[in-house]
């Protein structure tokens, strides 16, 4: 095997220590998360940054036990689906784990969804019960399903409580009676624990089936570096949505199973994030590229003491080298690193090793322990060696079981050898570091050349007067497609279209040059921080 991890069989293998998974095949992800909690019962597990409500690990476990019995008393049975439709709060992980501990399957949904969008997920997943907040009740009442109201205002919702089938979180806990242990439910690690819907940036979202083993494996991969460093107590701020795999599996579940503290924040607010980092002495802040952009471009950052930060991690979309280096100046005593994962991989494929040695700034790091990969030629479907660009295929114990009720999509994504075809374009360098270039479907086809929008976007936001940018293909009779940019200027900027074109032209090959630049107020993005390129393309083409 080469130092890149590349073998003669065309497979890249992790260069990290082997992944040791629990041998008990009947272990649930809930039992796993609390396996060591008796060693630190009074340690804060969850803190609500909006209300300051705190649950110690002892209280957290006790509440999950009560909630799991509460769900059973409401008639929830093994393999039933329960929908969580709520913004972040400490009640979300409690309910998520309570659902799973009862033997049911948790599915989560974006609280910004319209009734129409939510209806599609309800129709697909067929939940028996909905967990939401009073503020969102109007969106779910038409489904006529039993509903649990959670959150700080749930006890003040007496008009809603008078409705049939509506209970509060307090009612759910009370239903359990005096219980002190989890329900007697038979589990296998291979059982389905959650149904998370992919963001659908390139089409209809699909239900990703994740098992107990997927969550357990992913959580160990994510926290391995902390274990190797012997770190005892870290504090993570979770403002990324818990309905998404990044907020749920990578930040919340993975860190709780290690005994770290997770601070829940209901919605993104840059100044509130900075205040909370200072107030709670946050050590780890995991973000998406738009937040890195905000941190580097906003002068408000200088008002706050961020010295507790040891680590800023970014995921969900590629992050350019220039932006990473700018962000690193904000945390001189910490490290800015990047990882790569997707819902289908329970959130992780690779992450940078930040424990010293040569940095490969701009890469998505080395394969996580237990993960294998291939870089496959888009044309020949043959595996490629280091420094060759192709589609990223991955496999390992964290890979999804498939798409819910969608065997055709499953077959197109997972092949007979267990490889998950990510649809992402990338390559490994000679040291085994993965570079994710872009989505294959989003490449701009210019006269036979392929132009990656993410590369141009990374260059654009490195300009001091550009706050954000998106690049999309525009139909062209001669070239097929040409790259055009939509740019958000900083306040008081006098930047012109020609200025932007020249800035890019001096850094790229001629076929990558921008043919048009339009200035806009904001770039459309999903809740997980991914650019909604498809929405913009459809809007632009409808006006041609």
UniProtKB/Swiss-Prot annotation:
Compartments where located: Cytoplasm, Cytosol
GO molecular function: ATP binding; CoA-ligase activity
EC nos: 6.2.1.-
Cellular component GO terms, alphabetical: cytosol
Domain of life of the source: Eukaryota
Expression by tissue: Mostly expressed at low levels in glandular trichomes (lupulin glands) after flowering and in flowers, and, to a lower extent, in stems, leaves and cones.
Pfam families to which the protein is assigned, alphabetical: AMP-binding, AMP-binding_C
Region (SBD2) residue spans: 339-403
UniProt KW Ligase keyword: yes
Transmembrane residue ranges: none
Assigned keywords, A-Z: ATP-binding, Cytoplasm, Ligase, Nucleotide-binding
Keyword Disulfide bond carried by entry: no
Name of the top EC class for this enzyme: ligase
Annotated residues for binding of ATP: 198-206, 338-343, 424, 436-439, 530
Region (SBD1): 269-338
InterPro entries: AMP-bd_C (IPR025110), AMP-bd_C_sf (IPR045851), AMP-binding_CS (IPR020845), AMP-dep_synth/lig_dom (IPR000873), ANL_N_sf (IPR042099)
Domain comment, as recorded: Both substrate-binding domains (SBD1 and SBD2) are involved in the substrate recognition, and are sufficient to confer the substrate specificity.
Family: Belongs to the ATP-dependent AMP-binding enzyme family.
Record protein name field: Probable CoA ligase CCL7
Native source organism of the sequence: Humulus lupulus
Protein encoded by which gene: CCL7
């Amino acid at each position: 095997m080469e130092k890149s991890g590349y073998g003669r069989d065309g497979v890249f293998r992790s260069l990290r220590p082997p992944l040791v998974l629990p041998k008990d095949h009947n272990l649930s992800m809930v039992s796993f998360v609390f396996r060591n909690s008796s060693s630190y019962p009074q340690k804060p597990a969850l803190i609500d940054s909006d209300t300051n409500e705190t649950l110690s690990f002892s209280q957290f476990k006790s509440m999950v036990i009560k909630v799991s019995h509460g769900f059973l008393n409401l008639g929830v049975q093994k393999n039933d689906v329960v929908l969580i439709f709520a913004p972040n709060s400490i009640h979300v992980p409690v309910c998520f784990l309570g659902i799973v501990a009862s033997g049911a399957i948790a599915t989560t949904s974006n609280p910004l969804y319209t009734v129409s969008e939510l209806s599609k997920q309800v129709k697909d997943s067929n939940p028996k019960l909905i967990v939401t907040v009073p503020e969102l009740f109007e969106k779910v009442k038409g489904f006529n399903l039993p509903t649990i109201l959670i959150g700080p205002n749930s006890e003040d919702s007496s008009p809603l409580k008078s409705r049939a089938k509506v209970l509060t979180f307090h009612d759910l806990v009370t239903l359990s009676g005096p219980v002190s242990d989890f329900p007697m439910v038979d589990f296998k690690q291979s059982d389905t624990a959650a149904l998370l819907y992919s963001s659908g940036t390139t089409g209809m979202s699909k239900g990703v089936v994740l098992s107990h083993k997927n969550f357990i494996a992913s959580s160990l991969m994510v926290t391995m570096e902390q274990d190797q460093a012997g770190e005892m107590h870290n504090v993570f701020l979770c403002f990324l949505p818990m309905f998404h795999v990044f907020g749920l599996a990578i930040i919340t579940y993975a860190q709780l199973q290690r005994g770290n503290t997770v601070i829940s924040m209901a919605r993104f607010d840059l100044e509130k994030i900075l205040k909370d980092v200072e107030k709670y002495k946050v050590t780890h802040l995991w973000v998406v590229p738009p937040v890195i952009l905000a941190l580097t471009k906003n002068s408000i950052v200088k008002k706050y003491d961020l010295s507790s930060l040891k680590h800023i991690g970014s995921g969900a979309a590629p992050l350019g080298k220039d932006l990473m280096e700018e962000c690193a100046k904000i945390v001189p005593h910490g490290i800015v690193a990047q990882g790569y994962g997707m819902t289908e991989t329970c959130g992780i494929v690779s992450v940078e090793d930040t424990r010293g040695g040569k940095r490969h700034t701009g890469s998505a790091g080395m394969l996580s322990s237990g993960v294998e990969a291939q870089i496959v030629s888009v044309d020949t479907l043959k595996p490629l060696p280091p420094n060759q660009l192709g589609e990223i295929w991955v496999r390992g114990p964290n890979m999804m079981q498939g798409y819910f009720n969608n065997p055709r999509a499953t077959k197109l994504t997972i092949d007979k050898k267990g490889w998950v075809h990510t649809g992402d374009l990338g390559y490994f360098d000679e040291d085994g570091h993965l570079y994710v270039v872009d989505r294959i479907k989003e490449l701009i086809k210019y006269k036979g050349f392929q132009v990656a929008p993410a590369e141009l976007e990374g260059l654009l936001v490195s300009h001091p007067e550009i706050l954000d940018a998106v690049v999309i293909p525009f139909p062209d009779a001669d070239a097929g497609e040409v790259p055009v940019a939509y740019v958000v200027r900083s306040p008081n900027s006098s930047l012109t279209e020609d200025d932007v074109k020249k800035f890019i032209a001096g850094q790229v090959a001629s076929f990558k040059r921008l043919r048009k630049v339009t200035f806009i107020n904001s770039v459309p993005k999903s809740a997980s921080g991914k650019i909604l390129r498809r929405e913009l393309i459809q809007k632009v083409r409808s006006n041609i």
